[in-house]
């Protein structure tokens, strides 16, 4: 079985979905820009040797339809011989794309794959065209399709207070802002063309979604949006709506060494798991336990953790049951998370993995975990190991 390694990882800046910098950029443009950018950073790689492109995307319609992976590859001018497939496991789509590519490499069906994901939530809203089967309500509560209400349920089950949520959200913005000021995102962001408020073209090289002015006191003034009468989840403690793409260059360790490329991380273990759709945000817990078991490791072995912040009310129960609450400032989402940066659905899996790998390098860490919840009750996890 071949060992799978990451030789590079990149992302676009995260743009605001409502009137943001990428309002005139299409999902294919963001994706093609990254495909070209990651190959330009690694000239040792002959594009003709890429076996396949695995690209995550949730809302596969409008500009993201008709296999956005292939459309972006053609737009990027990549060799027509390279295959391309768009992968959908809802919020875990691009992490699933990584898993699919890894397995192809492990069994020898590929030596090099290009992996990533995109979501332009400004152009293709999350609920666009969604039509749940009426019979689904026989087995699943209707509210299970409303992500904010599942976060409310999970938070209540675990006794997560409004104060805790507001503090977690403020932490996300503060850490993401500090990471920006200190240049900690510089190596993972590929500057990308966008449009300023006045319509002029400019190059965006920072995440415009972060709100550095966020405070716990300010968040406390917001009203609950999903359960106005009894809820605690607000817009401020939910992941921001944003547009973005992320990419990884993945290959066998043997191929990376033959090309003289630096191995940034190995894939140690992968897992997915299901959970009750009504508390879909709990998925990272069973998925992480599976991945740890497959890796022969424990949570204490993880030096750095990226836990996707769909909602504060969702992240905190997962952190609690994974034994991470006492280690937040040492291990978890050290550069902030999706509450500050946004959660462009199909992009987020490889986005958090990219941030994780950069953090592992900065901290000289051995093991890192990237994990996320998935709508309708799933979780996905990947354990990375540095050489």
Curated annotation (Swiss-Prot):
Any one Gene Ontology molecular-function term assigned to this protein's record: acetyl-CoA C-acyltransferase activity
Residues annotated as the enzyme's active site: 91, 343, 373
Record-level GO BP terms: fatty acid beta-oxidation; phenylacetate catabolic process
EC nos: 2.3.1.16
InterPro entries, per database record: FadA, Thiolase, Thiolase-like, Thiolase-like_sf_Thiolase, Thiolase_acyl_enz_int_AS, Thiolase_AS, Thiolase_C, Thiolase_CS
Reactions catalysed according to its record: an acyl-CoA + acetyl-CoA = a 3-oxoacyl-CoA + CoA
UniProt keyword Nucleotide-binding, yes or no: no
Any single GO CC term annotated in Swiss-Prot or TrEMBL for this entry: cytoplasm
Keywords (A to Z) from UniProt: Acyltransferase, Cytoplasm, Fatty acid metabolism, Lipid degradation, Lipid metabolism, Transferase
Main location: cytoplasm
Pathway: Lipid metabolism; fatty acid beta-oxidation
Protein family membership: Belongs to the thiolase-like superfamily. Thiolase family.
Function, as annotated: Catalyzes the final step of fatty acid oxidation in which acetyl-CoA is released and the CoA ester of a fatty acid two carbons shorter is formed.
Subunit structure: Heterotetramer of two alpha chains (FadB) and two beta chains (FadA).
Stated name of the protein: 3-ketoacyl-CoA thiolase
Gene from which the chain derives: fadA
């Amino acid at each position: 079985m071949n060992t799978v390694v990451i030789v590079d990882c990149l992302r676009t800046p995260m743009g605001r979905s409502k009137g943001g910098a990428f309002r005139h950029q299409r999902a294919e443009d963001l994706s093609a820009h990254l495909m070209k950018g990651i190959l330009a950073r690694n000239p040792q790689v002959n594009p003709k040797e890429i076996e396949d492109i695995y690209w995550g995307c949730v809302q596969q319609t409008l500009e993201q339809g008709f296999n956005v992976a292939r459309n972006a590859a053609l737009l990027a001018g990549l060799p027509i011989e390279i295959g391309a497939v768009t992968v959908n496991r809802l919020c875990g789509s691009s992490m699933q794309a990584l898993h699919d590519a890894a397995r192809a490499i492990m069994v020898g069906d590929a030596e090099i794959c290009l992996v990533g994901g995109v979501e332009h939530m400004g152009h293709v809203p999350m609920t666009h065209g969604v039509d749940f089967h009426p019979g689904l309500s026989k087995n699943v509560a209707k509210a299970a399709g409303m992500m904010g209400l599942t976060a409310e349920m999970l938070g209540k089950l675990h006794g997560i207070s409004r104060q805790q949520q507001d503090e977690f959200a403020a932490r996300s913005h503060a850490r993401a802002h500090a990471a920006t000021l200190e240049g900690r995102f510089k190596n993972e962001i590929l500057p990308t063309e966008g449009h300023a408020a006045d319509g002029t073209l400019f190059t965006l090289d920072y995440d415009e979604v972060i709100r550095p002015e966020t405070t716990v006191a300010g968040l406390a003034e917001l009203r609950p949006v999903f359960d106005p009468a009894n809820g605690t989840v607000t817009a401020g403690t939910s992941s921001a709506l944003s547009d973005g793409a992320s990419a990884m260059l993945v290959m066998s360790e043997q191929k990376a060494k033959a090309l003289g490329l630096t191995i940034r991380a190995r894939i140690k273990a992968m897992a997915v798991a299901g959970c009750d759709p009504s508390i879909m945000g709990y998925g990272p817990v069973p998925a992480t336990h599976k991945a740890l078991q497959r890796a022969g490791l424990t949570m204490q072995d993880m030096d750095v953790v990226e836990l996707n912040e769909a909602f504060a009310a969702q992240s905190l129960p997962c952190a609690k049951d994974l034994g991470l609450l006492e280690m937040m400032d040492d291990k978890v989402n050290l550069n902030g998370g999706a509450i500050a940066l946004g959660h462009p659905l199909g992009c987020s899996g490889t986005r958090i993995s990219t941030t994780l790998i950069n953090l592992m390098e900065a901290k000289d860490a051995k093991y890192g975990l990237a994990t996320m919840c998935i709508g309708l009750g799933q979780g996905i996890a990947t354990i990375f190991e540095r050489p």
